[in-house]
Amino acid sequence: MTQEKKDFTIHALPVLKDNIIWIWEASGQAVVVDPAVSEPVKEFLSQNNLALNSVLQTHHHDDHIGGTRDLISNWPSASIIACKTDLERIPFQTHSVTDQEVFTLFGYSVKVLEVPGHTRGHVAYYLSDTNADNRNPALFCGDTLFAGGCGRLFEGTPHEMFKSLKLLNSLPSNTKIYCAHEYTESNLHWANHLYPEDLLIKKRLEYVSSQRANGLLSLPSTIAEERKTNLFFRARTLEQFSQFRKHKDNWMS
């Protein structure tokens, strides 16, 4: 039986130094993406009279799962969705998912995309069937793709991350990118350092710097924007990607 699609809103909840917890709200319920901590989430849900429906976990790092156990204690019936290969590192998951698996939330299809590189068991969640509602597709991508950057390679290889980014780069250009950290300004400073004559990077850096100076987020981004100004997205070869990643790892702004 097909679930009726529900009107929804995606909220940004900044926590810690630069984490963003995304809260997908519909009809008095919420899906929380990568809850680094629990108290701000509980406060937001309480203030907005929302019940926790599900938690989407992109990977096992503590600044993404640190608040989940406490949320479970408050909403024990909530679904905890995470990658099956990370079951040992995210043992409280109730729904273990695999690459290309599709499940439904709020009447919308959500596709699981395995995107290793930052960690071995990293996944992204792609909400695609929104066109009939005049909405952009949405991608919750954790620490794989950032606005202007990508995640460090803590467990994966350059080849794995390059392949993961190529997969995300193949998504529709109007896809909104809901990544898990506000790193955009730093990423663009690095890109501008390498390519000071690139007007697209320079213009975006000016805009993002203005946003941040006024206390505003630079997120979400879009696939189209990343194709223009994200050097990791623009890398044509594995060698070029690897050079960018090595340079970024050792760069000090």
Swiss-Prot record:
Gene Ontology terms describing biological process: methylglyoxal catabolic process to D-lactate via S-lactoyl-glutathione
Lineage: superkingdom: Bacteria
Broad EC category: hydrolase
Cofactor binding note of this UniProt entry: Binds 2 Zn(2+) ions per subunit.
Annotated Zn(2+) 2 binding sites: D63, H64, D143, H181
Catalytic reactions of this protein: an S-(2-hydroxyacyl)glutathione + H2O = a 2-hydroxy carboxylate + glutathione + H(+)
Cofactors: Zn(2+)
Pathway involvement of the protein, from the record: Secondary metabolite metabolism; methylglyoxal degradation; (R)-lactate from methylglyoxal: step 2/2
Binding locations of Zn(2+) 1: H59, H61, H118, D143
InterPro entries cross-referenced by the UniProt entry: Clx_II_MBL (IPR035680), Glyoxalase_II_hydrolase (IPR050110), HAGH_C (IPR032282), Hydroxyacylglutathione_Hdrlase (IPR017782), Metallo-B-lactamas (IPR001279), RibonucZ/Hydroxyglut_hydro (IPR036866)
Keywords for this protein: Hydrolase, Metal-binding, Zinc
Enzyme Commission (EC) number: 3.1.2.6
Keyword match Membrane: no
UniProt subunit comment: Monomer.
Function: Thiolesterase that catalyzes the hydrolysis of S-D-lactoyl-glutathione to form glutathione and D-lactic acid.
HAMAP family: Glyoxalase_2
Family, per entry: Belongs to the metallo-beta-lactamase superfamily. Glyoxalase II family.
Protein's name according to its UniProt entry: Hydroxyacylglutathione hydrolase
Organismal lineage: Bacteria, Bacillati, Cyanobacteriota, Cyanophyceae, Synechococcales
Name of the gene encoding the protein in the UniProt record: gloB
